[in-house]
From Swiss-Prot:
UniProt keyword Nucleotide-binding, yes or no: no
Entries under InterPro entries matching the protein: Ribosomal_bL9, Ribosomal_bL9/RNase_H1_N, Ribosomal_bL9_bac/chp, Ribosomal_bL9_C, Ribosomal_bL9_C_sf, Ribosomal_bL9_N, Ribosomal_bL9_N_sf
Coiled-coil segments on the chain, per record: none
Protein name: Large ribosomal subunit protein bL9
Keyword Amino-acid biosynthesis: no
Similarity remark: Belongs to the bacterial ribosomal protein bL9 family.
Assigned keywords, A-Z: Ribonucleoprotein, Ribosomal protein, RNA-binding, rRNA-binding
Matches recorded under Pfam families: Ribosomal_L9_C, Ribosomal_L9_N
A cellular component term, taken from the record's GO annotations: ribosome
GO molecular function, one term: structural constituent of ribosome
Organism: Klebsiella pneumoniae subsp. pneumoniae (strain ATCC 700721 / MGH 78578)
Function: Binds to the 23S rRNA.
Length: 149
């Protein structure tokens, strides 16, 4: 199925690209999320007429994401207290929700879906570097300091 992308989509393309995707992917994800429209003659003409407006909107979203990333980077470190054993192993773990709540409490609103834990959940006391994907192109880093209660 041919679609016109209205937003940058990972591993697919960016604004204005006409790409061929499976019908289910287009019907169930791209179109309902507002990331694409079917590539009919009418939609192609409509898109070309609004291209500058859509590019400006995309630039505004990117600028807002970069501003949020700067706020997150400015935090430098966030401390989370959790129960731990003698050897520094936590009872349980610290996941994306706990990290998002701690960063939000520190003053920057973050959704748990933006937290990236490349090595899985945090299970030990100490400092851990955590990435945040604020936008498809914008990343931020914060050091999470896990301390025993």
């Amino acid at each position: 199925m041919q679609v016109i992308l209205l937003d940058k989509v990972a591993n697919l393309g960016s604004l204005g690209d006409q790409v061929n995707v499976k019908a289910g992917y287009a019907r169930n994800f791209l179109v309902p999320q507002g990331k694409a429209v079917p590539a009919t003659k009418k939609n192609v003409e409509f898109f070309e007429a609004r291209r500058a407006e859509l590019e400006a909107k995309l630039a505004d979203v990117l600028a807002a994401a970069e501003a949020r990333a700067e706020q997150i980077n400015a935090l430098e470190s966030v401390t989370i207290a959790s129960k731990a054993g003698d050897e520094g192993k936590l009872f349980g773990s610290i996941g994306t929700r706990d990290i998002a709540d701690a960063v939000t409490a520190a003053g920057v609103k973050v959704a748990k879906s933006e937290v990236r834990l490349p090595n899985g959940v945090l299970r030990n006391v100490g400092e851990h570097e955590v990435n945040f994907q604020v936008h498809s192109e914008v990343f931020a880093k914060v050091i999470i300091n896990v301390v025993a209660e």
